[in-house]
Curated annotation (Swiss-Prot):
It catalyses: RNA(n) + a ribonucleoside 5'-triphosphate = RNA(n+1) + diphosphate. This is DNA-directed RNA polymerase subunit beta'. It comes from Thermotoga neapolitana (strain ATCC 49049 / DSM 4359 / NBRC 107923 / NS-E). GO terms for molecular function: DNA binding; DNA-directed RNA polymerase activity; magnesium ion binding; zinc ion binding. Zn(2+) 2 binds at C1107, C1295, C1302, C1305. Its cofactor is Mg(2+); Zn(2+). The lineage of its organism: Bacteria, Thermotogati, Thermotogota, Thermotogae, Thermotogales. Transmembrane segments: none annotated. DNA-dependent RNA polymerase catalyzes the transcription of DNA into RNA using the four ribonucleoside triphosphates as substrates.
Length: 1690
């Protein structure tokens, strides 16, 4: 026989950051090409994204080229195509990889909040992004121009910016001037005057050239000078009018210098003496002086010494005007030694008198249009410009141009530039000391170049992902950890810097602990997921549709290949940078193609397809409803299922359902086939024949089908599956037609009706699954709801009306006397005969003999009642009762309690059959005439309108305000509506058989509110509103909050039978539409609430029978704002006692006199027990005097004090064993005592107990009386008090099980009224129990057409949300400079911190109300009340610790701080609020479900002082972990001495670092060093508390100094936060914020121990609950041979 057993294979799952080597190890090869498949052959391209060599063959067991085909070649690698022969399934598993040409940062670690990279490197995220994406920094700074480079590598005129200048200045000596940047120079340069041009050039201080264009307008005087004259002035010299230009001089005659002949040139006025041909002399030329006469003739011979000219006198030339001397261009002069000039030939000397002159400096590079000496007119162009735009001028140059061109150009002293930035990745320690720079500092590229010039090869900086990688590689985590810990010790714990450091320290510790290397956050290799997870499919028309991922991978590969090529070519840095940035963006898009709208800091553009749809990245594949977690891992499609419309199956038993034949054949096809084949041959031909038998629906097939489904069960499910009763098992019955038939009684749990609802059918396949479905899920065994322990599968509508009709009587029945009754019968059978013969009717009064509790009695009743009672268990029969909905429900519940689930199920079937039959017999119809309008109605309306008229008159006269007028009118109409409702009900009740009255009164359909609208009055209507508006003021009317601002003060005074007018119809539309809108808007919200609840509680299962705790919670009535939300009997039901319940008077264990049951610890309380305990009250003495015998070995079983002094103990001391010992020492054997029997009991009178004066409350309802209160009672002369026992019950809130809860603390499994089984998934049940009504309530519109006063579900849901998300509704608002916490509803409630009395309520000098509380000791505590809050207490009232003194919302963390560590007071307050919201909607949910959720919300604690644990202050840690850590610390402290001996001689596994008093890090020992006694002593002196040593090739940690335990505070988390802080990362990631949860878990190397249910569903194994528990794992299920054959075929 085949066996099957369910062993759980996976114990835990760890997540870590993948190293490049790990990614490569996953891979089947590198993807080098972006191609996917060949467009002609449709085969994958080699080395492409679908390559068969990398990812596996496309065809099963066939290589790409077809050389190897078939399974026999499995594992062979084809030498031709390189493809390994294997199953095509490999393409779902095998991965590839892309080797990146440049590293790229993993965006999750950059963009997470807080950023992991930013925290670890202590860098700003914006700076990090700038580095990674090769960004720049905007710098506004001055510039300088080098004027004297001295011995530096600068050139004169080089521009240096301020940042660089500061760097160079520290090391080099050179001169600079500040630079000015030219802006908007006007051009061209125009002459302002007429005149002559003079051009001059000169060099500036920066070595650049300036051309001076000088334009002069001059008066010029010409003076001729003659040869021989001596000019006494210099060119350019200033002279005065009349000043000599040449001096007067006598000119000697000229003589021949040698023999020869003369030549006279009259034109040039010269005499040339030429020597004789025989002579060696050269010819000599003489200029004839002005005024001399030539004495020789042309050609004349002369002798040496002959006179050639006469002597003469040259007169002086005088200046005719004042001005500047200018030598003419024709003037030929010779400079003399005395500085004068001799005129060699006639010429001109000019004197220029400047009338006007303009200078135009022009910078080098400008085009000059004029030449020297040119004459220009005013307005002529001199040059194209004088300066260039953006030209840098030194301050000297700037002054020149500023003085010559004022207002013709602007300058900027500072320049604004975007400078590329780099991060320092390595720096010489000396340079670091000198410059103050360190690794990780960001500088601009200019600064880096400056540092490089000064410190060549001593500083390295870079940008991009490679820079981040270097920084991460350079981190020494151990050293960083020691540094951070040392720095934290110096800072105040609450400072923001300390918080930042703590966050960083946690990350460092996480990296150390997990063994992850920080540089792995920068990718060198990108994994390529298997191709079958990113398929490409051919669509109509031959085109291909591909997954977005392929497009993202393609883009990445293209950019990667392009960058690699550019690197090989040695492309310029700027091109490479751009390409690297694009590669980084491609990797980003692949991992997370996110957008800013998702709350990310992303500066990236989102990649979109041609239709503008963002491409789905790997992150999108994981997160959200359609992500991998929620869609594929937590929700799976199920085979062997069908779906069809449901119809009612009145003939079915409760555990049966009707399945259409066709559907059943399809569902059970493999089983039918197996059965058919089991009878004959299994050959292929035979198989085809048998298949044809099924497909052609031959008679044999139906016979086999009938046989197959016998004994099987199927699961029926109706969406939405809100709780476990939405899936139940039924025995299938084959039916004709196409609809599934459903038993009408199981409609309520499914929330099904027959207006077109559909249901799904599932077939459990294995014998184990069938057994589980039958015994655990059969509808017969799921009648009782696990939410409240009462029946949920109940008769409705027709069945109710049938039963009601059967048991109702005429209105005269009760007044009818026995003697007046005509029909008398000796037995029910006789009566039935009379009925069938037509003598009597169902409702005819009869006298009949029936058996009641074994006795024959004659009773007055009707045949209908006899018929109905005949189906009931004998001791539950009641012949004088009308059985309406409530009565039938109570009957089913009582039957279940007394006789068990089977009898209850049978009763339901019987009631169903009876109900349907007699509903048909009743012939129920509905007509207008059945709507009876009360005759008094018109008179009442007339009277009311008159009153309204008087109110309006008073308003118009000014006697009433607008608010008062509205309030009065609303109150008036509310009263009238109520009065007419009562009258309508009475009018209908006159005829007990009125169809409408029967429907409403029986509870079958509708309610009196609807009848009131049909036949009475519609009443006031409500307006639409925002339920969270702060403006809503509500008033209480008959226990109901009425929002006056939201109510029309004009009523609809008509009813629907007579019809409404247009205005009234219009008014009605508001509320009617509001109902529809609320339903639509809030359904999703309620679903989200359920989802959060499930996520929080899913791991809570019953893990052990008893945790052994003695803690518990006090049983009480839950009272909120004076309204009883839950009575104590409901509170007690299903609980287990935490301690014995003692009789208040005798102090002995309480016993139920009826059942004899004793209420000791660990007793489970049933309904009857709860009722008994809740009603048990006694009058007990406050004080009793007695004399006790102290020779007995027991003390009184109540609080007692000595009534006489004993030794050193005074009168009034509590009686203890120490007092008894002292008395015995004195030789006493009896002591007088005063006993207080009331101490330890609970005050049970709902009216407070006052003091003698009647001013102060001494006791309030449900107060536990302690000795202080007892003495107060005694002082005030109170002798007896009505009390009840103090009952402490166990609760999930106080359970001490490490994981989940124990069976004793959970108590009763409400679905079967037995103690809960170990393994029960109580968390899921709790979440479903709370969430299901929330969803249901939104889907039913509770507003009856928007009529005022109907309960409003939205406000209920808001309350639920406020309770489960306590901090989401807190708003810190600044008002008047102060921070105030406000809510949607008012302000913060003031909490009382002591037990005491309200002494006084007064107003202080600022006008604020102050409440003074006097405690028991007489101390006064003052509470100032916020302006918006209203006082809830009154003078003399008793208040207890944790009570609210004012209106407003409770700030939960304040309440938590008021109480003990348990958080019970907080939970009970939350419970009151939330129960109230549900109770108002008529929904019953047991408290334990809320307690489980609150337990999870209170499961985290805030670390105040981490002691010597690895936690950080302000870190949220599971309470379980803290308690475990503290336990381990205390155990470790006990082993310190032993450990010190043990470590001697062992080798250190890590180096040991500590910090000195100066703040320097010191290495105490190196890795591998042996631990000696001296070294150990050194460790202890340095305060090292634990060391890691190597022991048998393992690293073991030993504690060598005592550690401090953790100090903490309990914290209340919201549902969302509790779900995200769940210890298992798989469940948290599947909930919300997937990327961040996975990021944080990977850094930590988090291990998910698979404790919860979700995690196990995700990994695909049985959940650790129910039959999935390890206890059941070894059970082997034997299956029948038939089932085995079916299994094989299936």
């Amino acid at each position: 026989m085949p066996m099957s057993s369910f062993k759980r294979k996976i114990k835990a799952i760890q997540i870590k950051i993948a190293s490049p080597d790990v990614i490569r190890s996953w891979s089947g090869g590198e993807v080098k090409k972006p191609e996917t498949i060949n467009y002609r052959t449709f085969k994958p391209e080699r080395d492409g994204l679908f390559c068969e060599r990398i990812f596996g063959p496309v065809k099963d067991y066939e290589c790409a080229c077809g050389k190897y085909k078939g399974k026999k070649y499995e594992g062979t690698v084809c030498e031709r195509c390189g493809v390994r022969v294997e199953s095509r399934e490999a393409r779902r598993k095998r991965m590839g990889h892309i080797e990146l040409a440049a590293p790229a940062v993993h965006i999750w670690y950059l963009e997470s909040i807080p950023s992991v990279l930013g925290t670890l490197l202590n860098m700003n995220v914006s700076d990090l992004e700038n580095i990674i994406y090769y960004g720049s920094r905007r710098v506004i700074e001055r510039a300088f121009i080098v004027t004297d480079p001295k011995d530096t590598p600068f050139a004169q005129g080089d521009i240096i910016y301020e940042t660089e200048y500061r760097i160079y200045r520290k090391k080099w000596d050179f001169e600079v001037e500040q630079a000015f940047i030219v802006k908007n120079p006007r051009s061209p340069v125009l002459s302002d005057i007429d005149g002559e041009v003079i051009l001059r050039t000169e060099k500036t201080v920066t070595g650049r050239e300036i051309t001076w264009i000088i334009v002069r307008n001059v008066n010029r005087a010409e003076h001729t000078v003659l040869p021989g004259m001596i000019i006494t002035v210099k060119d350019g010299q200033e002279v005065e009018k009349g000043q000599d230009l040449t001096r007067e001089m006598n000119v000697d005659p000229l003589y021949a210098p040698f023999d020869g002949h003369v030549e006279i040139d009259e034109i040039s006025n010269t005499i040339t003496v030429k020597p004789l041909t025989t002579s060696k002399d050269q010819p000599v030329v003489f200029t004839v002086p002005y005024g001399a006469r030539v004495l020789v003739s042309n050609g004349q011979k002369v002798k040496k010494g002959d006179q050639l000219t006469t002597s003469t006198t040259l007169p002086a030339v005088k200046a005719s005007i004042s001005g500047r001397v200018k030598f003419g261009s024709n003037l030929n002069v010779r400079a003399l030694e005395d500085g004068n000039f001799e005129v060699l030939s006639s010429g001109n000397v000019y004197i220029e008198q400047v009338i006007e002159e303009r200078k135009y400096p022009v910078f080098e590079g400008a085009l000059v249009y004029v030449n020297n000496g040119d004459q220009v007119k005013k307005g002529d162009h001199l040059a194209d410009r004088f300066l260039f735009e953006e030209e840098y001028l030194s301050s000297t140059e700037y002054k020149i141009f500023e003085s010559h061109y004022p207002t013709m150009f602007d300058v900027e002293e500072r320049t604004e530039n975007d400078r590329p930035i780099v991060v320092i990745t390595d720096i010489d320690p000396e340079v670091s000391k000198e410059t103050g720079l360190k690794m990780g500092d960001i500088i601009t590229e200019n600064e880096y170049e400056a540092y490089l010039q000064i410190y060549p090869e001593k500083i390295v900086a870079d940008a991009g992902a490679q820079a981040i990688k270097k920084l991460l590689q350079n981190l020494d985590l151990e050293e960083l950890r020691a540094e951070l810990e040392a720095e934290l010790k110096k800072l105040p714990a609450s400072s923001s810097k300390a918080m930042k450091l703590r966050r960083r320290l946690k990350m460092v510790k996480d990296f150390i602990k997990s063994g992850n290397k920080p540089e792995w956050m920068v990718l060198e290799v990108v994994p390529v997921i298997p191709p079958d997870l990113r398929p490409m499919i051919q669509i109509e028309g031959g085109r291909f549709a591909t997954t977005d991922l392929n497009e993202l991978y393609r883009r990445l590969i293209n950019r990667n290949n392009r960058l690699r090529k550019l690197l090989e070519l040695g492309a310029p840095e700027i091109i490479l940078r751009n390409e690297k940035r694009m590669l980084q963006e491609a990797v980003d898009a692949l991992i997370h193609n996110g957008s800013d709208s998702e709350g990310k800091r992303s500066r990236r553009a989102v990649l979109k397809d041609r239709n503008g749809r963002p491409l789905k990245s790997l992150t999108d594949l994981l997160k959200g409803k359609k992500g991998r977690f929620r869609r594929n891992l937590l929700g799976k499609r199920v085979d062997y299922s069908g779906r069809a419309v449901i119809v009612v199956g009145p003939h079915l038993k409760i555990h049966q359902c009707g399945i259409p034949k066709k559907m059943a054949m399809e569902l059970f096809k493999p089983f039918v086939l197996a059965k058919l084949l089991g009878e004959g041959s299994t050959s292929k031909t035979m198989r085809k024949v048998k298949k044809a038998i099924i497909e052609k629906e031959m008679p044999e097939a139906w016979e086999v089908l009938e046989e197959v489904i016998k004994g099987s069960v199927v699961l029926l499910n109706r969406a939405p599956t809100l709780h476990r009763m939405s899936i139940q098992a039924f025995e299938p019955k084959l039916v004709e037609g196409n609809a599934i038939q459903l038993h009408p009684v199981v409609c309520p749990p499914f929330n099904a009706d027959f207006d077109g609802d559909q249901m799904a059918v599932h077939v459990p396949l294995s014998a184990a699954a069938q057994a589980e479905a039958r015994f655990l899920m059969l509808s017969r065994y799921n009648i009782i709801s696990p939410a409240h322990g009462k029946p949920i599968s109940l008769p409705t509508q027709d069945i109710i009306i049938g039963s009601y009709y059967l048991t109702t009587v005429g209105k005269d029945f009760d007044s009818l006397k026995e003697e007046d009754i005509r029909w008398r019968f000796s037995s029910p059978e006789e009566a039935m005969l009379a009925y069938h013969l037509g003598y009597i009717k169902l409702h005819t009064p009869i006298l009949i003999k029936v058996s009641i509790k074994g006795e024959e009695k004659r009773i007055k009743t009707t045949l209908g009642r006899v018929i109905f009672n005949s189906i009931l268990p004998e001791d539950l029969r009641d012949y004088n009762r009308i059985f309406d909905k409530k009565q039938i429900n109570a009957l089913v519940y009582e039957t279940f309690k007394r006789y068990g689930i089977d009898r209850a199920a049978d009763l339901l079937d019987d009631v169903k059959d009876l109900g349907f039959h007699y509903a048909t017999v009743s012939g129920l119809t509905l007509s207008l005439k059945d709507l009876k309008i009360p005759p008094e109605r018109d008179e009442i309306l007339k009277r009311t309108w008159e009153k309204v008229r008087i109110i309006e008159e008073n308003y118009e006269r000014g006697f009433l305000t607008e608010e008062q007028r509205k309030s009065e009118i609303i109150r008036l109409w509310m009263n009238v509506t109520e009065e007419i409702t009562e009258l309508t009900s009475k009018t209908l009740a006159e005829d007990p058989f009125n169809p409408i009255y029967m429907m409403v009164n029986s509870g079958a359909r509708g309610n009196i509110d609807q009848v009131k609208q049909l036949a009475g009055i519609r009443g006031l209507m409500i307006k639409a509103y925002d339920p969270r508006s702060r403006e809503i003021k509500s008033k209480i009317f008959k226990g109901q909050a009425i929002h006056e601002a939201l109510t029309f003060d004009y009523p609809v005074d008509k009813n629907l039978r007579e019809g409404v007018d247009i205005l009234q119809f219009f008014i009605s539309t508001y509320g009617a539409r509001k109902g529809q809108v609320d339903t639509a808007m809030n359904t999703s919200f309620a679903g989200y609430l359920t989802r959060r609840l499930v996520d929080v509680a899913q791991s809570v299962t019953v893990t052990e029978p008893d945790c052994g705790t003695h803690e518990g919670i006090r049983a009480m009535d839950l009272i909120k704002d004076g309204t009883v939300v839950e009575k104590m009997n409901e509170f007690l039901f299903g609980r287990v006692l935490a301690s014995d319940v003692l009789d208040p008077e005798t102090k002995e264990v309480l016993k139920n006199p009826e059942t004899g049951k004793e209420y000791t610890r660990n007793t489970m309380l049933t309904d009857d027990d709860a009722n008994f305990l809740a009603s048990y009250k006694k009058m007990v003495d406050v004080v009793k005097y007695d004399e006790i015998d102290i020779t007995e070995l027991s003390l009184p079983n109540m609080y007692a004090e000595i009534a006489e002094p004993v030794g050193e103990y005074k009168e009034g001391t509590e009686l203890t064993w120490d007092v008894v010992k002292a008395a015995r020492n004195e030789g006493k054997y009896r002591i007088k005592v005063k006993m207080y029997p009331v101490v330890g009991t609970v005050y049970a009178n709902e009216q407070p107990l006052y003091d003698k004066k009647g001013e102060r409350e001494l006791l309030v309802y449900q107060e536990v009386i302690n000795e202080v209160v007892a003495k107060l009672l005694e002082e005030n002369g109170v002798e007896k008090v009505l009390v009840r026992p103090d009952i402490i019950v166990r609760s999930p809130l106080t359970c001490e099980s490490e994981y989940g809860v124990c069976a004793a603390c959970y108590g009763m499994d409400l679905s079967n009224h037995k103690i809960v089984n170990v393994g029960e998934a109580v968390g899921i049940v709790a979440a479903q129990s709370i969430g299901e009504p929330g969803t249901q309530l939104t889907m039913r519109t509770f507003h009856v057409g928007g009529v005022m006063g109907a309960s409003d579900i939205v406000s209920g849901l808001t309350t639920v949300e406020k309770t489960f998300e306590p901090y989401a509704f807190l708003r810190e608002e600044k008002s008047g400079g102060k921070k105030e916490i406000r809510k949607y509803y008012g302000s913060e409630a003031v909490l009382c911190e002591v037990d005491g009395f309200v002494k006084d309520i007064a107003t202080d000098e600022t006008g604020r109300t102050v409440i003074y509380i006097e405690d028991y000791a007489g101390g006064i505590h003052a509470y100032r009340i916020p302006k918006r809050a209203k006082v809830k207490v009154k003078k003399g009232q008793k208040v207890l610790r944790g009570d609210t003194l004012t209106t407003g919302a409770i700030v939960w963390w304040k309440l938590l701080e008021l109480e003990s560590e348990k958080g019970v007071l907080t939970a009970m307050n939350l419970l009151k609020i939330i129960k109230n919201a549900y109770v108002q909607q008529g929904v019953s949910i047991h408290d334990k479900h809320f307690e489980i959720i609150f337990r999870q919300m209170l499961s985290m604690a805030l670390v105040i002082d981490p002691g010597d644990s690895d936690y950080l202050p302000d870190q949220l840690v599971p309470l379980v972990d803290i308690k475990r850590t503290n336990r381990e610390i205390l155990e470790g402290n006990a082993r310190v001495e032993e450990n010190r001996k043990w470590v001697i001689g062992k080798m250190l596994a890590k180096r040991v670092i500590t910090e000195t008093d100066d703040g320097e890090l010191v290495e105490l020992a190196q890795k591998g060093e042996e631990v000696t006694e001296e070294l150990l002593k050194k460790f202890i002196e340095a305060g090292i508390k634990e060391i890691d040593v190597v022991e048998k090739d393992r690293v073991v940690t030993y504690q060598i100094l005592p550690k401090e335990p953790i100090k903490y505070k309990r914290r209340l988390l919201s549902l969302k936060k509790a779900a995200l802080n769940y210890p298992g990362w798989l469940s948290a990631a599947a909930f919300e914020e997937t990327a961040w949860v996975l990021t944080a878990a990977a850094i930590e190397g988090k291990v998910d121990p698979l404790i919860g249910l979700k995690e196990n569903v995700i990994v695909g194994q049985l959940i650790p609950a129910g039959t999935g528990l390890d206890v059941f794992a070894g059970i082997q299920v034997e299956e029948t041979p038939r089932a085995a054959a079916e299994e094989k075929l299936a």
